[in-house]
Amino acid sequence: MAKLIFLTGLAFLLNAQLGSAYQLVCYFSNWAQYRPGLGSFKPDNIDPCLCTHLIYAFAGMSNSEITTIEWNDVALYSSFNDLKKKNSQLKILLAIGGWNFGTAPFTAMVATPENRKTFISSVIKFLHQYGFDGLDFDWEYPGFRGSPSQDKHLFTVLVQETREAFEQEAKQTNKPRLLVTAAVAAGISNIQAGYEIPQLSQYLDFIHVMTYDFHGSWEGYTGENSPLYKYPTDTGSNTYLNVEYAMNYWKKNGAPAEKLIIGFPAYGHNFILRDASNNGIGAPTSGAGPAGPYTREAGFWAYYEICAFLKDGATEAWDDSQNVPYAYKGTEWVGYDNVNSFRIKAQWLKENNFGGAMVWAIDLDDFTGTFCNQGKFPLINTLKDALGLKSATCNASTQSSEPNSSPGNESGSGNKSSSSEGRGYCAGKADGLYPVADNRNAFWNCVNGITYKQNCLTGLVFDTSCHCCNWA
C-alpha cells in the first residue's frame, strides 16, 4: 500500500478509484504517555497493522532547526520506528508544530531563505537519524493567530523548497524520497488566509484536512464536533462548518481529490446545558463540560471516556441531518463520532474519490477495548474495514496493545481482566494502584470506584514503594 504514495498522475488516480490506494493516517500524541491509569499510551500500544501511515506529534523548533520536545522523545522515536519491523509497508512521519506551538517560530523561520535552508537541512538530518519517512507540517495557521499575511505565500515557498530538497537528497543518496505532508485548516476563513491551494498541492504528497472542532463550548450552544453535513437551521458562516463543505472547498479550489485526506476525530466536545430539558443541537450552554478522568481537559473527551459516559446512563441520540451522534445526561452534553458515523463518512469519502482518512488521534480510540465493548481500536478498525485495508499482510502477533508497563511507569501494564474480577475491592478507595495480596505480579487498578485486575510484564513485580511495576 505505502509504495503507492510515490505514484502520480493517472496511475495514482485509477488506483484510488479502484479502492486500492486509500490511506489511513493515524496521529500519535507524545503527551498521551502522561495520562493516568488505563489512559496512558506509548508507541508500544500501537497495533502496527492498523494504519498505513503513523505520524508522531509533535516536534519543536529552535533557531530555525527542528528539535525534540519531550524529555524521552528519542526513546519513543525508537519504539515508533520498531513498528516497521512488524509491518514493512508502514510509513512513519514526524509532525512539527501543533496548536500549542503557536505561529511565531514558523514565521521567523520562513522569513528568510537562509532560515528556511537551515530548517530544511536540519529536518533531513533529523528524519534520517531517527528513522522517519517524512515530515508533516502542522502550522496552525499561516496568516492567522499572529502570523502575518505574507506567511500564506511563504508557506508555499517553504513546502516547495522542502519537497525539492527531499528530491535532491534522494537522488544523491539513492534512498527513497522523504515524504512531505501538511495538516491544514477546515475553517473557510483560515483556508483563505493561509493557503495557496493549487501551488501547495503540487508539492505536498498528502493534505490532511482537520475536519473537526467545528463546534465547541466556545460558542455558547451545543454543536457537533465533526458533522458530515450542515444542520438544517444553520445560516451564514455556520453553513461552512461541516466535513462536506470543507472538503469540497479544498477540492474545488485546486487540490486533487486523491491527495485530500479527511480528518476523523476519535474524541468529542462536551458542554454544560443551561437547561437539562433542552438537550438538542443548538441548545444554550453555560460553558465547557467537565474534564475526563484520563484526558483531563475541560470540554474534551476521548472516545473511550464517552463510552464510559454512555455506560453511566447517558442517553444517546442520532442526528440524521448531520449523520453523527450526541449524548446527554442531566446538564452534561457531548457531540462526537462513533463507529456508525465513521462508517458513513468513510462511504462518503469513497463516493467522492478522496484519498483516505486521517485520525486524531490513535491514543484517543478505545485502544484497550475496555470501555466500549467493541474490541480494541474500534473507530480505526471501522475505517480500516470500510477502506478495504483489512487484507493487508502484516504480522502483529507479538505486538502488545495493552496499557504500558515499565520500571517506574505508574500506569502499570499487562493483561487486564474484566472489572468483575475483584469486584468491590475499589469501593471507597481513591483512584490508584494497589497490590494483590497473593500475587506479586498483579495489582488492582481503581478508577472511579471500578475495579480492574492487571498484571505487570513477565519478570516484573508490583512495587508498593513507587506503586509501579519494577524489577523483582
From Swiss-Prot:
Q: Is Transmembrane given among the entry's keywords? A: no
One GO term of the cellular component aspect? Answer: extracellular region
Query: Its GO biological process terms?
Result: apoptotic process; chitin catabolic process; immune system process; polysaccharide catabolic process; positive regulation of chemokine production; production of molecular mediator involved in inflammatory response
Q: What is its main location?
A: cytoplasm
Q: Where is the active site?
A: 140
For this chain, the annotated S-S bridges are: 26-51, 49-394, 307-372, 456-469
Query: Recorded E.C. number(s)?
Result: 3.2.1.14
Ranges of Low complexity compositional bias? 400-421
Look up the coiled coil feature and give its residue ranges. none
Tissue distribution of the protein: Detected in liver and in serum.
**Boundaries of each GH18 domain copy?**
22-390
Q: Where is the signal peptide?
A: 1-21
Q: Where is this region: Disordered?
A: 397-421
Q: Which domain of life is it from?
A: Eukaryota
Catalysis: reaction(s) = Random endo-hydrolysis of N-acetyl-beta-D-glucosaminide (1->4)-beta-linkages in chitin and chitodextrins
Keywords for this entry?
Apoptosis, Carbohydrate metabolism, Chitin degradation, Chitin-binding, Cytoplasm, Disulfide bond, Glycoprotein, Glycosidase, Hydrolase, Immunity, Inflammatory response, Polysaccharide degradation, Secreted, Signal
Looking up CDD domains in the UniProt record yields: GH18_chitolectin_chitotriosidase
- Similarity remark: Belongs to the glycosyl hydrolase 18 family. Chitinase class II subfamily.
**Complex and partners:** Interacts with EGFR.
Question: Which PANTHER family does the UniProt record give?
Answer: ACIDIC MAMMALIAN CHITINASE, CHITINASE
Write down what this protein is called: Acidic mammalian chitinase
Lineage of the source organism? Eukaryota, Metazoa, Chordata, Craniata, Vertebrata
Gene it is expressed from: CHIA
